[in-house]
Structure formats: structure tokens, C-alpha cells
Design a protein with these regions (language model features):
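Rossmann-like dinucleotide-binding domain for NAD(H)/NADP(H)
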Residues: 15-16, 101, 149-268, 304-305, ...
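An N-terminal-biased, well-structured beta-alpha scaffold segment characteristic
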Residues: 1-15, 119, 139, 275
């Protein structure tokens, strides 16, 4: 938010951040808001300052034995869980990526989906980055299934809780309260939440403690010292995507793997349970650490606000209990080299295979057993469909109607199963109307838009 990263990159200036320094401060602020809501601290304080003694009006609630639902079990979410256990709260947790191994050890009950949290929680606190998956994660439909006694807390990013839906719920007394430390636009032009006694608003104070600022400064200084001494460049926002002087073909495969990871992060929704990669052909005889890391970067990036790189990705993956099962086979004859990745989630299992042709041309050559060939660049629409005539023409017609140019198209079939798929590389990102229209075609079973660059 404070540095023009693209300009710094153009000038050759390395930019680094310190994501861990404010973890405790953000978690403590979350607990402060939970406590303040539960005991009506803010309205009671304002009332007494106004000369009114209203002890009965501001009777509160205990945290003891209440259910706290935490959405996002990263560093801050886990810190909140540990603190809340000190108040004897029952913790339910859900993470869109994967629950960290330590979560259950500290007493967090891992939920399979968000509905469990929405229906059973007395308090719901969000600790996820803002992205396409989490924007408006909590809206009117989600609030409808919550307890009337629920209280919502957002110390993460504005927009994760839909503000219109939250306002309507507070106005109708559909929920017991809310606490907001973040807003879609800061400072917020909209002051409507200030009218509710049961809604606490603070000006993005999550990381605003003296101790957090010292921690951030110390971490920044240590990162700088390490970099100057030639050590690993930690938390770099604009570092090169590969490390060391790898062979050119390895660099190409690292980029291919990143794009395959990005594709799988879209077509394999759900919490990650298992990750496997396979190297075949001559690439299996080369140093491929950067390729596996490139794959993880693509797979995990949308779940983190900080840019992932070759230094921080393995650490962040380990924190979430994600590891790669890697196999190599140099003795193959069907293709010179290939990289294949398989991701198992709680909802689906997907496999994508790619190869580098001519040393520079990145290609996807197989998706879930469908043999195809498509260039993994820009936006790629992946469609799983019934195998019937007219599919290609119908897809092309819809794209043409929305002035979308098809760059490459891969088509795969499984005649015995009467199933097929298309992978369509586009010259621009399709708008929602085009995707909706494609999804309504009678032969389409699943459709995904993968952003690979």
C-alpha cells in the first residue's frame, strides 16, 4: 500500500515486506472487539460519559462455552484461536486452502464447509485475504442461516463481509452485532455503520501497536542484513521467480509448473488434501527444486495476499500441512519431457500435464486423462462437457458475441464415457455474462476460468 512496486521493479529496486510482525497485534485486536461487543463496552462508555447510568440496558454476554467460528487458519487466525481458548470458547475453523496440522492440537474443530460455521457459531471472525474466492464471502444468503445471536468480526480486509447485507441485517436486528476494523475503501465515505449501537467500528487498528511496529522494524532490518550478506531474500515482492543459475529448460519448466498450479487452483476447488508431481523424460535428470516450488506458487498464490516466491512458499505450505509427493522417471519414450501435477481436495481430484516444446513453447498436453494441446497463457476457459456435435461451434459463437478472440483451443474426448472437454486460451479475460452464457449451454457440466499470467 505504501510503495509503488512496479516502478521500484523497473528501477531495479528490491521491495520486501514483513508479514509476520503484526500477527499478535491483529489477533489481540480481534479479541478486543469480541470482548467489547459481548460486554457492550462502547455504548455503555458513551452513555456514562453523557451522564446516564444504564446498568440494566447494557447487560452483556460471557464468552465462556460460546462457539467461535474462525474463517482462515493462517498465522492470525491460529493466534485468535489460541487466545480464544483462554476464554474457554469452543473453536470451529475452516480454511479455504487447508487446515494447518496444529489446528486440532490446540482444540480447533475443523469444519468441512462454511455452512457448519454459519449455522453453529455465536461469533464469526474472518482472517482470509481478499480475492475472487473470498470477496462477499458472507452475504445475505449466509446471514440468513446464522443464529440471531451471532456477532460478526472483520479484522482482515474490507469486502469479505458484504456491507449492504451486513447493514440490512443490523437494521433488521437479524444479528446481535458486528465489529469492523477494515472497509472496502479507507477511510470509508459511507458512515452508515456508525448509527448502530451494536456495531463497533475502528480505523484499521489491527497492526497499530507500539510493539507491532517494533517487531516489523526489527524484521525488516534483519531481512535487509541477510540480503546484504548474500543470504536468502525473504518476503520479496518483486524478486525473480526462479532461483540460481538453473538451465534454461528448467526455468521454462518452472514457469510451466507455475501456470499448471494456477490452473489446478481453479479447476480443483476445495481444501487441499494431497499434492503429487511427476517428472518424466530428460527433465527428471535435472535439478527441479525450482520447478516444484514454481508449481506450489501457482497453486497457492490466490490464498495469500503477499506475493509468493522461491523463498517463502515452502515455509507457508508447510504451515498449512501441504507437502509434495515427487516422483521421477527419466526412461520414457512417448514424450521427450513432461511435468504432471495431481491435486486431491475434499471435493475433487484433478491432474494436469504439460511439456515444453522446442525449448520455449509451453503447452498443456493432458487434463484429467483427456489428451489435448493448449497454450497456458492469459485466461484459459476449461469446460468439461458431454461428447456431442456442435460443441466447438457453440462455444465459438458465444465468444464471438462478446468480442472474445480464441487464441488456441484444445479438445479431448473419452468416447466410451461419452465425455469430452475443451481448454480455450483467450486474448482477454471473459466477462461474467459470457461465462454465465457458456455455463448455460446444455452440454456443459463444469466450467472454470483460469487466470494463468
Amino acid at each position: 500500500d505504501n510503495i509503488d512496486v512496479p516502478t521500484a521493479t523497473r528501477k531495479g529496486i528490491l521491495v520486501m515486506n514483513t508479514p509476520g510482525g503484526n500477527t499478535l497485534s491483529a489477533a489481540e485486536h480481534t479479541m478486543a472487539l469480541i470482548l467489547a461487543m459481548s460486554r457492550n463496552v462502547v455504548p455503555a462508555c458513551n452513555s456514562l460519559k453523557g451522564g446516564i447510568w444504564e446498568k440494566k440496558k447494557y447487560m452483556g454476554n460471557q464468552l465462556n462455552n460460546k462457539v467461535l467460528g474462525i474463517i482462515g487458519l493462517g498465522r492470525i487466525g491460529m493466534a485468535v484461536a489460541r487466545m480464544a481458548k483462554g476464554f474457554n470458547m469452543n473453536i470451529m475453523g475452516y480454511d479455504p486452502l487447508a487446515a494447518p496440522p496444529d489446528a486440532e492440537k490446540i482444540g480447533v474443530r475443523i469444519c468441512k464447509d462454511l455452512d457448519e460455521i454459519f449455522k453453529q457459531s455465536d461469533y464469526i471472525s474472518v482472517h482470509v485475504p481478499k480475492n475472487e474466492q473470498t470477496l462477499n464471502m458472507i452475504g445475505a444468503e449466509q446471514i440468513k442461516v446464522m443464529k440471531p445471536s451471532v456477532r460478526l468480526i472483520n479484522c482482515a480486509r474490507g469486502g469479505i463481509i458484504n456491507e449492504d447485507a451486513l447493514y440490512e441485517a443490523l437494521a433488521a436486528r437479524r444479528i446481535a452485532g458486528a465489529a469492523l476494523d477494515v472497509f472496502p475503501k479507507e477511510p470509508p465515505e459511507d458512515k452508515r455503520f456508525t448509527i448502530f449501537e451494536n456495531c463497533i467500528v475502528t480505523p484499521h487498528l489491527g497492526a497499530s501497536t507500539e510493539e507491532a511496529q517494533v517487531e516489523v522494524a526489527v524484521e525488516a532490518a534483519q531481512i535487509l542484513v541477510d540480503a546484504i550478506k548474500g543470504g536468502p531474500v525473504r518476503n520479496a515482492l518483486n524478486a525473480p521467480s526462479t532461483m540460481g543459475a538453473a538451465p534454461a529448460i528448467v526455468t521454462q519448466y518452472a514457469e510451466l509448473a507455475r501456470r499448471i498450479g494456477a490452473m489446478l487452483s481453479t479447476i480443483a476447488p476445495g481444501q487441499i488434501q494431497k499434492v503429487q508431481v511427476r517428472y518424466r523424460g530428460s527433465i527428471a535428470e535435472m535439478p527441479v527444486e525450482s520447478v516444484s516450488l514454481g508449481f506450489l506458487i501457482g497453486l497457492l498464490q490466490k490464498h495469500f495476499e503477499m506475493p509468493l516466491n522461491m523463498v517463502n512458499t515452502s515455509v507457508l505450505a508447510k504451515e498449512r500441512g501441504i507437502s509434495i509427493d515427487e516422483t521421477k522417471n527419466a526412461e520414457v519414450k512417448d514424450v521427450a519431457s513432461s511435468f504432471s501435477a495431481r491435486v486431491v481436495t475434499d471435493k475433487v481430484t484433478r491432474t494436469v500435464t504439460g511439456s515444453v516444446f522446442g525449448g520455449t513453447r509451453l503447452r498443456i498436453i493432458e487434463i484429467d486423462g483427456f489428451n489435448i494441446e493448449v497454450t497456458p497463457q492469459g485466461s484459459v476457459i476449461v469446460i468439461f462437457n458431454d461428447d456431442k456435435p456442435g460443441v466447438i461451434g457453440s462455444v465459438g459463437t458465444v465468444c464471438g458475441r462478446y468480442n472474445i478472440n480464441i487464441c488456441t483451443m484444445g479438445v479431448g474426448q473419452k468416447p466410451a464415457e461419452q465425455k469430452a472437454m475443451l481448454a480455450v486460451s483467450l486474448d482477454k479475460e471473459p466477462d461474467e455474462k459470457a461465462v454465465d452464457e457458456l455455463g448455460k449451454l446444455d452440454f456443459v457440466n463444469e466450467i472454470y476460468v483460469c487466470k494463468l499470467n
